[in-house]
UniProtKB/Swiss-Prot annotation:
Name of the protein in its database record: Uncharacterized transporter HI_1706
Annotated TM spans: 9-29, 48-68, 87-107, 139-159, 186-206, 224-244, 259-279, 314-334, 345-365, 397-417, 444-464, 470-490
Organism encoding this protein: Haemophilus influenzae (strain ATCC 51907 / DSM 11121 / KW20 / Rd)
Coiled-coil region list: none
Family: Belongs to the BCCT transporter (TC 2.A.15) family.
Domain of life, per lineage: Bacteria
Amino acid sequence: MTKRTSFNPLVIGVTLFFILLLMAMIFIAPEQTQALLNQAKSGIFANFSWFYVLTFSVFLGFLLILSVSSLGNIKLGQDEEEPEFSFLSWLAMLFAAGMGVGLMFFGVAEPLTHYLSDITAGSAEHKQQEALLHTLFHWGIHAWAVYGTIALALAYFGFRYKLPLALRSCFYPLLKDRINGKIGDAIDVMALLATLFGIITTLGFGSSQLGAGLEQIGWISQNSFALQVGVIVVVMCLAVFSAISGVGKGVKILSEINLTLAFCLLLFVLISGPTLYLLSAFSDNIGNYFSNLVQLSFKTYAYEQEHTSWFSGWTVLYWAWWCSWAPFVGLFIARISKGRTIREFIFGVLVIPSLFGILWFTVFGNTAVWLNDGIAAGGLGEFISSPEILLFKFLNYLPLPTITGFVSLLVILLFFITSADSGIYVLNNIASRDKSLASPAWQAIMWGTLMSVVAIVLMQSGGLANLQTMTLIVALPFALLMLVMCFSLWKGLIADKKYFSTKVNPTSIFWSGDKWKSHLEQMMNQTQEKDILRFLKNTALPAMRELRQELTGKYNLSVEINTLFEQEEPALELVIHKESMRDFMYGIKSVGREVSEQLINDENLPHIQHSATYEPYTYFFDGRVGYDVQYMDQDELIADMLKQYERYLSLLDDVGQELMAHEQTELAE
């Protein structure tokens, strides 16, 4: 029977109360509410800009430290797990995550705006270089550091600790089971509000740019507020339809088509613009960005008060926007990164999208400045106060403006729809009590309606500035929460490293010498799955039964044997139950591996006749790498099980191993 709702009542209740309170204030006292929002924005700019700057630098430094330390070897999953996607496919999906409405909106607008502002000085060439530097700083590694931090925490605790893929799970080392209580609910409320306003801000940018594009290609006479409302409603209806109708595969195909169109647009501008100059600028921009990265990472313009307004209106607002988008992008990255090592994960997340961002802004930004100073004769710069229209004005100076304008509109529209569709999924995930269950259709409709109404009301009362202000306000406590998350992740990783570094014999082959002939006979016969099944039934199962009888009869322990002979990899498990701690589990499964054709055809190895060989490998409750036990007899298997049980008991007695030994299955509720 389908549940009426998957919502956590407290989380959704507090979130809706905050939203409805804000809407009521805007309707009842619009001027006072606007003044209050402006005051809050000014207060954050004046008192917390330094906090945003240092926080983002901490996120980046934290990831870099993990990547170069031994903790970077830890897998996001069990030790034997392989990545779900190939390396190239994974990089392609990270590349896709780096695309969005923001690049279309700011690709031309931001570099040109910085170029024409007083934040840059000197010759035209130096101003252009500085303009690109500031743009790349806003869209580069720092943005991906905040995404990577939350994605790493989600993936690590989700795949390594087997916890739900939820924000509250990231605080397990600090809170243990309390993540299921009121503190966990408070974490979800903060994440929900931050994500909600981050997505709504993107809706505002997308709707204004779509309206401007429709006006430019002549489909409408004016980009009015009413038109933008219509765009939001239509796009949200399409996103809700996608979310509730099970056309996810179709949306995935649309996303891939959209990425192709965006890349084609990029190539078109590169080829039709000053190609050689852009390629040279790309190299120059990379070098200039990385050589100035440390200084910019900590720059608050404390000694350049004349630029603090620019700093607040650009850098601080961007940092708040990235914080609000972190759960959204982080959850996507976490879901596709199972089986990667932490080092590999950090390299991919920080480098690949950032390099693409540098390429995008080089092609669009440098070309925009080149056009403005050349054939446009300053004509593009006249529109910097209306950034939503700049992309289309820019395309008018290149060949085929009608076609490229239409393609740009299509790309923005599809990014808009897929972002809203994914946003509904993420909001449902954060607000749900059980993350593993599908949410009923009415919840998608509710989120679509709520996002549309809030976006429209805020835009009507104060335009895009109000959307940015709300993002700035809700992102501040979430940024603080993410700092605590870093500490929690560090604590979990240290416990993980200590636990898995506990020495245990890597192999359990008992080469005592008195059975060498029988061992040699086994080695000279290529074992097949039927041989492993015989070993499990005739040797391993009697050994487990004998040990169970001793443990239950003499020591009154709760012991269970699971016979899993019918599954794809036949297996056998001995489980000793413990209250409040992880159960001890000693399993043996049939593991197959391919044999080289050269070995099969080698006349000196007549015993190798099959294309695959099978071995009985152990596996454990904590995901440690197992070992081959095919040469053990019944007594030796019992001795090996007791050796692993002794290790388990010693870890339970060690206070430092409490985190890894604590039972976590109830957290999946």
